């Protein structure tokens, strides 16, 4: 079914910045609904799952039947639609009890319901995506210190596994797998940018933890090998390769990717990595100010200002 673009004037009027705009929705961790820093009670797991479904499709209509299928999957009770409506009423009451006009946020619209979020700063997922995209653009242009600022900001939105309190629901598992890939991409590009800025020593400990958690993610192993090598730990870089090779052989019966094998042979021959390690071109961000101002180059003292929360 086609869906109309969201307009803050749709149905219930303009969102009130002092009420609806103060509500924060968080999915990068346990589901949270905060009002000015106070967590609001969200009820039973099924009721929270209804809110999660609406939040993942924010500003779009979610059919009542889709909510029923997501919550009960193949075994919905006879009164499932009415139960969903009860959950919606309970969530509206929670908002109203907190002093928020729920009609500005959670509206009924055939064939179901719509969760209105007028400002993407209200949702941690939207903040993550915006910062991730800015960081990837900066990295592609060689603005690695700027990329670090954005990518680090993106990761600051994560509090734990996606919707970690609702992992028993299939729709959450599917969404979590997809979003975890985005999170690991940000970690990988952050490590790449840090190595380019001469901060391999900072990212190595975090990369070790990440490869332990995601042993088949070869892009993380690549950055770990590079980090060790450019930091003059050739033996550690070689050891990282052999750990990856053993893991893949024993558990999947495959070899590392050709790019990883090529990197390994370059390390063995002690060749320069200029083609693999990015170079800072320009556009360092002054991290001591608010939005930051670009200057010509990254100095040694500036490197200590890089906000890499990876140690």
Swiss-Prot record:
Belongs to the AfsR/DnrI/RedD regulatory family. The gene is moaR1. Transmembrane segments: none annotated. Keywords: Activator, DNA-binding, Transcription, Transcription regulation. Acts as a positive transcriptional regulator of the molybdopterin biosynthesis moa1 locus, promoting the expression of the moaA1B1C1D1 genes. One of its GO terms (molecular function) is DNA binding. InterPro entries: AfsR-DnrI-RedD_regulator, BTAD, OmpR/PhoB-type_DNA-bd, Sig_transdc_resp-reg_C-effctor, TPR-like_helical_dom_sf, WH-like_DNA-bd_sf. Residues 15-117 bind DNA. This is Transcriptional regulatory protein MoaR1. Disulfide bonds: none annotated.
